[in-house]
Amino acid sequence: MNISNLKSRFPVFKKNPNLVFLDTAASALKVDEMIEATNNCYTNEYANIHRGNYELSSKLTKKFEDARKKVADYLNTSENNIIFVKSATEGINLIASCMSKRFLEDDDEIILSYLEHHANLIPWHLIEKKIKIIPLGLNENSEINYDELNDKINSKTNLIKIGRAHV
């Protein structure tokens, strides 16, 4: 993959060619095609999805569900497993809330690494009265200590949450 060709699809790099953008979980940069598609939607097609009983709403609902199917196919999963959220933070909050209500029992344990982003720590601490948070340390290279992880997994472990990016 040629990084220059990829960067050329993002308008922001025209004025900021040396920009290194690492805040994608909160606010992703947009490629030209996405900006054009969004503009077209707001200009020509905008309607409430799954809410209206009129042509614009039906067409946009179909596009929305077609997108869900494409994501599901790409991930080789069912469309029922795909939930669209506005940010990684919202997704983490949703998962923590749902798990605390349906899947977590008193005294269950969740293993969280010291590398977690703040947005991935707060939701679990909010439900800590029900569960126990087990911190996962780092090795001498400041990487996740997988040997320690194996030692911490036990019959009470319900979830292991290790972020793969910290931006």
Roles of regions detected by a PLM:
Residues 1-164:
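Pyridoxal 5′-phosphate
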Residues 167:
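Calmodulin-binding IQ motif helices
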